[in-house]
């Protein structure tokens, strides 16, 4: 069941329910995500840790799944991991940075957990790209498969990749999937 709410109501609901993973889709329907279990939480941490180390060395700002972004289509989304270039982040006001940043990240990662519906995550990835995200990875540990989404290109499906390359969006970033598949 999806409940329609006003965007301004979402911010209040999200702030009052910080212990819940909430998103608002472009149709202003509230989406409640299943809580993350230990295995998915451990895998998410490995992804955000690798991205965070790269960010500390090369710049920009990286975020974990608790950050909600206001996308251009009106959706409020919280990817499992994301990154924004420093120049784009600095273009936001301090108030925008403190709230739900009104910006599509340059890069996003969604990690499929056992309770996630694959087609729902795939639709979310398409939404990210249409909102301006340059590179997105949908990591599916169950099938040891990664779907790579890029601006202006068809989705690429990688079977059992060991390392993902950040390409021109994140030059030099390589995400090791070895412990993600465990």
What are these regions (language model features)?
Residues 1-182:
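Gly/Pro/Ser/Thr-rich low-complexity, intrinsically disordered segments predominantly at protein N-termini
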